[in-house]
Amino acid sequence: MTGLKRKVLIGTITRNRPIMLQNLLKSYTNLIVPDNIDVSFLITENNNEKTLHNVIAEFQRYNITSEVIYTNEPALGIASARNHVLNYAIDHKYDILTFADDDEQVEPDWLLELLKERDSKNLDIVGSPVRFAAPLDKLHWWKNIIWRGVNQVNQGAEKRARTLYDQGKASKLKLATGSWMANLDFFRLTGLRFDTSLGQAGGEDWQLWQDAKEVGAQTGWTPYAIAYETIPLSRLKLSYYYRRTRDHARMVYHERLKKGKAGRTFGSVLSRIYKVLTSTLLLPLQKERGLITIAANLGGLVGFIEGAFGKKSAHYINIDGN
């Protein structure tokens, strides 16, 4: 603590997305910061060397009252980069850490609303919605179908999360780091970190949430702290959502295997088969959303089977966006 002020570190990890990063940092300049908070920004580039000096310098010019720290993490992998930020926050005696992804932008009250939810319920970890930003350019008809489908799926997920929140059951929601806040005393006490053994498979945020719940973390979610994700055109393909879910399923299988729970995969496979069949039958009604559901569940089905045969995921070797 600094006097009566809490120290908050707004963490960002990034790799090969300078334009998207600029947009995120620009949105940070509009954040509403409570009077009892000291905010610093840490931008960690997941690269052997720093390549973003101009981007960081521009951001610093707009943040004359806040400290801006720029570091790099040479060990490739989202978990390694997130741990770099988490360790920095702990070592430098911050009280609160937040994450938003480098392909996002946040609303001005994003930090305020996360803090409000965390403080009102004394939460260790809290998340919030990441909505999809509307495309800036007119899309090809097929890409527009994919866009509408993924947006409908995302809106449905947020609606279900809001229902649980209204029922007082937000602790059941899996929390990703796209819009995320943590009480650092919890991490000091438990020593929990993101699982670097996942490499570039992804899924380290949900895995951390699961590990945190197992050691007693109080977790929650707020519908009021909004972030917006920009979807690159390269992701507006059914094949992308197939690969993404396939790679995630591979990761889940190997995590279950490590914990002696690989037997649960049989149920997961049956569930995906059921969802593919029902979504195919309901496609005339579900339309765009149904296409995404079919592609994703086919990917999950294949991923669990491939995982059982030893295949692992490296989903984030290739980076979408710029």
For the regions a language model picked out, list residue spans one by one.
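Short, flexible, basic/aromatic active-site loop/helix in glycosyltransferases
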Residues: 146-172
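A conserved acidic beta->alpha catalytic loop
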Residues: 42-56, 104
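Glycine-rich, basic loop-to-helix element that forms the pyrophosphate-binding segment
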Residues: 73-92
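Short beta-strand-to-loop acidic/aromatic patch adjacent to the donor-nucleotide binding site
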Residues: 93-105
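Conserved donor NDP-sugar-binding/catalytic core segment of glycosyltransferases
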Residues: 109-143
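Acidic donor-binding loop at a coil-to-helix junction in glycosyltransferase catalytic cores
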Residues: 177, 199-210
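Short, well-formed alpha-helical segments that are part of the catalytic scaffolds
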Residues: 17-32
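Non-catalytic, C-terminal membrane-associated alpha-helical segments of glycosyltransferases
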Residues: 243-250, 261-322
